[in-house]
């Protein structure tokens, strides 16, 4: 049964078409793994729903023509617990929503399930998607499948989609839904040695995705290969009338653009990303991959993104301001956690003090301060102006180049028991935040292992709506570097 868990989504689809195994057998193998997992990746398990989808898939394969069957039919997947799932607990990994059961389905999870995917359950994450290590969850931290070689220590899976990345890397599911506000798909994918893609802002509907920072939030996917990411992304993209920023641009068949050809493509290397604190091993792999792309016909050129140095403070001001607004709805009145008190004001205060975790409260306070009447112009308005400059830097760069190649994270994953201060945690997102502020598509792809035996990754950033292009460049990198999948235990 373990052999079935090693398969890619494409291999699963081919095996199901050829009747090499049934969807029930495939899903049962994954259910068994999820029931016995020790990573704390799944916080809600839905074996009955997965088996129902598997039986429906087997029925489809028995009577439908091949070209009418979705490539995700019967494929076991996990869904980050930020996406509302009708009738299934959705908590955002917060005490505030510990027992919340939505009455509606998020658009992206609905599209995924309508494609025939079998949902194994809901995945652990940093509370309200705020964090870079998946150590801020009300349900406890997630463990990475990779272990540090020198001392045998466990390491973090990254965040906030740590459960999504760890579950895919650990062969608990073939693919997972995640969300990316400032790097929450790409950074954990990098730490876990898997592929993570954030599409252009507006490509995927935000309807039913619990809001963190609305001008930045975007759904994404995590898989074990670039081609698998293309297949999953195809399923969840598309226009949605229920999301005001949803794009009406047609969604191409991303998988058909993966041809391994980068001849004539101009790849930009921004000088501003060569900064202090970046691992020498990551720099070495960055240079090695750039050389490989050049050998395969791409033109590698230097570019400048002068306002990159402001990205982290700008991001944390904007996302914290939007957090303080979005999370104001959790007051103990309508739904969610509630502390009974003598007065309404006391009930509000106690509910929010006990219902939110430390990191969430920290960001609410920062955001409330930035939006206050005495500081709005000084902080929030100025941050939005610099965000526009960051976006313009990318627009100018893409007038001369096709793609940008940068690291996904400055270092390998750090120890699970290490407690870096919040500033260090912020810096983990230094390479992912700029693309988020600009709303650009970006993909993280593994490129090797460090001397400690931990995954290293690079990121390909593309122009607006060029998900197909970054998937193709990432596939070329994947061909050169190989997949760094950890052996199945």
From Swiss-Prot:
Pfam family of the protein (one): Amidase
Gene3D superfamilies hit by this protein: Amidase signature (AS) domain
Alphabetic keyword roster: ATP-binding, Ligase, Nucleotide-binding, Protein biosynthesis
PROSITE patterns assigned: AMIDASES (PS00571)
GO biological process entries: translation
GO molecular-function terms, A-Z: ATP binding; glutaminyl-tRNA synthase (glutamine-hydrolyzing) activity
Active-site residues (renumbered): 80 (charge relay system), 160 (charge relay system), 184 (acyl-ester intermediate)
GO cellular component: glutamyl-tRNA(Gln) amidotransferase complex
Reactions catalysed according to its record: L-glutamyl-tRNA(Gln) + L-glutamine + ATP + H2O = L-glutaminyl-tRNA(Gln) + L-glutamate + ADP + phosphate + H(+)
EC id: 6.3.5.7
Listed InterPro entries: Amidase (IPR000120), Amidase_CS (IPR020556), Amidase_dom (IPR023631), AS_sf (IPR036928), GatA (IPR004412)
Summary of the function given for this chain in its UniProt record: Allows the formation of correctly charged Gln-tRNA(Gln) through the transamidation of misacylated Glu-tRNA(Gln) in organisms which lack glutaminyl-tRNA synthetase. The reaction takes place in the presence of glutamine and ATP through an activated gamma-phospho-Glu-tRNA(Gln).
Assembly, per entry: Heterotrimer of A, B and C subunits.
Family per record: Belongs to the amidase family. GatA subfamily.
Protein name: Glutamyl-tRNA(Gln) amidotransferase subunit A
Gene (name only): gatA
């Amino acid at each position: 049964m373990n052999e079935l868990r090693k398969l890619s989504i494409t291999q699963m689809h081919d095996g199901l078409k050829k009747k090499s195994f049934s969807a029930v057998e495939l899903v049962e193998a994954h259910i068994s793994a999820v029931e016995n997992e020790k990573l704390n990746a799944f916080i809600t398990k839905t074996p009955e729903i997965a088996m129902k989808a598997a039986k429906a898939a087997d029925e489809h394969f028995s009577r439908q023509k091949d070209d009418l069957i979705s490539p995700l039919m019967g494929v076991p997947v996990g869904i980050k617990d930020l996406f509302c799932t009708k009738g299934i607990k959705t908590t955002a990994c917060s005490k505030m929503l510990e027992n919340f059961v939505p009455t509606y389905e998020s658009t992206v999870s609905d599209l995924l399930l309508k494609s025939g995917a079998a949902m194994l359950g809901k995945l652990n994450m940093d509370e309200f998607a705020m964090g870079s290590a998946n150590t801020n969850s009300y349900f406890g931290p997630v463990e990475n499948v990779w272990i540090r070689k020198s001392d045998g220590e466990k390491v973090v899976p990254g965040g906030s989609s740590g459960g999504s990345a760890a579950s895919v890397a650990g062969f608990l599911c073939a693919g997972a839904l995640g969300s990316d506000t400032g790097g929450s798909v790409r950074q954990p994918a990098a730490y876990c040695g898997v592929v993570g893609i954030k599409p252009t802002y507006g490509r995927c509907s935000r309807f039913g995705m619990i809001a963190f920072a609305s001008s930045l939030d975007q759904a994404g996917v995590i898989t074990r290969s670039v081609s698998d990411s293309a297949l999953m992304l195809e399923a969840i993209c598309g226009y949605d009338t229920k999301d005001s920023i949803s794009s009406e641009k047609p969604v191409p068949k991303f998988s058909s653009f993966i041809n391994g050809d980068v001849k004539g493509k101009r790849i930009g290397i921004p000088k501003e990303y060569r900064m202090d604190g970046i691992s020498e091993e990551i720099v070495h792999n960055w240079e090695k991959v750039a050389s490989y792309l050049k050998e395969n016909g791409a033109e590698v050129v230097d570019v400048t993104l002068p306002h990159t140095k402001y990205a982290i403070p700008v991001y944390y001001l904007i996302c914290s301001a939007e957090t303080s607004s979005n999370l104001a709805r959790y007051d103990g009145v309508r739904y969610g956690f509630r502390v009974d008190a003598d007065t309404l004001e006391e009930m509000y205060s106690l509910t929010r003090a006990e219902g939110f975790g430390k990191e969430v409260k920290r960001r609410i306070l920062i955001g409330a301060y930035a939006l206050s009447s005495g500081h709005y112009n000084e902080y929030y308005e100025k941050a939005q102006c610099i965000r526009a400059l960051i976006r313009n830097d990318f627009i100018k760069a893409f007038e001369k180049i096709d793609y940008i190649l940068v690291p996904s994270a400055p270092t390998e994953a750090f120890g699970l028991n290490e407690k870096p201060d919040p500033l260090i945690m912020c810096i983990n997102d230094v390479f992912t935040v700029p693309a988020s502020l600009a709303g650009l598509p970006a993909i993280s792809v593994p490129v090797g292992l460090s001397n400690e035996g931990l995954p290293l990754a690079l990121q390909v950033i593309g122009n607006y709506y060029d998900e197909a292009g970054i998937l193709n460049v990432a596939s070329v990198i994947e061909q050169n570097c190989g997949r760094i999948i950890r052996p199945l235990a």
